[in-house]
Each structure stands twice: as C-alpha cells, then as structure tokens.
Swiss-Prot record:
GO terms for cellular component: chloroplast thylakoid membrane; proton-transporting ATP synthase complex. GO terms for molecular function: proton-transporting ATP synthase activity, rotational mechanism. F(1)F(0) ATP synthase produces ATP from ADP in the presence of a proton or sodium gradient. F-type ATPases consist of two structural domains, F(1) containing the extramembraneous catalytic core and F(0) containing the membrane proton channel, linked together by a central stalk and a peripheral stalk. During catalysis, ATP synthesis in the catalytic domain of F(1) is coupled via a rotary mechanism of the central stalk subunits to proton translocation. Disulfide bonds: none annotated. F-type ATPases have 2 components, F(1) - the catalytic core - and F(0) - the membrane proton channel. F(1) has five subunits: alpha(3), beta(3), gamma(1), delta(1), epsilon(1). CF(0) has four main subunits: a(1), b(1), b'(1) and c(10-14). The alpha and beta chains form an alternating ring which encloses part of the gamma chain. F(1) is attached to F(0) by a central stalk formed by the gamma and epsilon chains, while a peripheral stalk is formed by the delta, b and b' chains. This is ATP synthase subunit delta, chloroplastic. It comes from Rhodomonas salina (Cryptomonas salina). It is a peripheral membrane protein. PANTHER family: ATP SYNTHASE DELTA CHAIN (PTHR11910). PROSITE patterns: ATPASE_DELTA. The keyword tRNA-binding does not apply. Its main location: plastid. The gene is atpD.
Length: 180
C-alpha cells in the first residue's frame, strides 16, 4: 500500500470500525476484500474517474447488498459521494487490521517450502498464540519453494525465518561468500 493510500485509508477505516455492526465487521471486510481481489473489472470500474458516482453506487449495491451489513453498504455509498471509493481496497485492508486488533486476533503470514499438514498448522497456531498472547491466530499460508526447506512467519513486525535459504545465507555470510 502506498503512503498516499495509507493516509487516505486510515481515517475512513477508523470511521468504518466505529459505525460497523460489530458482529459482522470481519465477515463484511473479508467479503469486500475477496470481491476486489477476484474481480479486476470491479477494481477498474470503481477506480475509473469516467464512471459516474451514481453508476459506482449501482455497481456496489448490486454486488454487496444482501451480502454485507446495511451499514457497510451505506459506508461505501459515502465513499462514492466523497470520491474515495477508489481507495476501498486500502480502506478494507486497514479496517480489517483494526477489527482483528479489537477482536484480539493476530494475523500471521506463513511461507513454507511445502504445504503444511493440518497437524503442523495447528501446532504452529498454538505456538503463535503462546508467543503473542492473542485469543486467535489467523494464518495466511502460501508455498514458496525457493525456501528449500523450513518456513518464514511474519506476525506484526516480527519475522521468524527457519528456512534453509536463510540458514545458507547466514552460513555464507559467516564464511565470507555470497549466495545469490
């Protein structure tokens, strides 16, 4: 997210968290994020200055009405009126982080060299809960074969890197060689 997007998104994300239905806020934000990530046409339509605000409202109502809380739809209408709907992705991402924080949910991004089994995933979640004292851990898993073996975890500002790739880098640094 660019610094301009962050500057624009933060106040709107704060406002959304204030007015949102507390029971559905995380589901609503996940629904918005999923719709935006899966539809490049939707992203283009709401970011296009040639598409009128009324047309953008119609698009949003047709996609989200009935799928998210009424206050969430109204909030997106306000974004259209203010000419800020193009920042919906950044606003949703920022608001989701705030909602997770309020619900004592930590987001952890995990890259592993192979797909983790359910037992490994559960063990990792338990360790991360103990480490962060969070009530819940939400994992975003991806496979990165360049790690050779092991995994990397980013949770908040902390990074845990147990990958073979990292160990080789450390070893080469110790030996004075360079590894590409």
């Amino acid at each position: 997210m660019s610094s301009k997007n962050v500057k624009v998104a933060k106040p709107y994300a704060d406002a959304f968290i204030e007015i949102a239905n507390k029971g559905s806020v995380i589901n609503d934000l996940n629904c918005i994020a999923t719709a935006l990530s899966e539809s490049k046409d939707l992203q283009k339509a709401i970011a296009n200055p040639l598409v009128s605000s009324a047309a953008k409202k119609d698009i949003i109502k047709s996609i989200f009405a009935g799928n998210v809380d009424e206050n969430t739809v109204k909030f997106m209408m306000v974004l259209c009126d203010r000419g800020r709907i193009e920042y919906l992705d950044a606003i949703a991402e920022t608001a989701l982080i705030l909602a997770y924080k309020q619900a004592s949910i930590e987001m952890a991004y995990v890259a592993s060299s192979v797909k983790l089994s359910s037992a490994q995933t559960e063990a990792l979640v338990d360790k991360l809960k103990a480490m962060t004292k969070a009530d819940q851990i939400k994992l975003e898993l991806k496979v990165d074969e360049s790690l050779i073996g092991g995994f990397k975890v980013q949770i908040g500002s902390r990074i845990i890197d147990t990958s073979v790739q990292n160990q080789l880098k450390q070893l080469s640094s110790y030996l004075g060689a360079s590894v590409a």
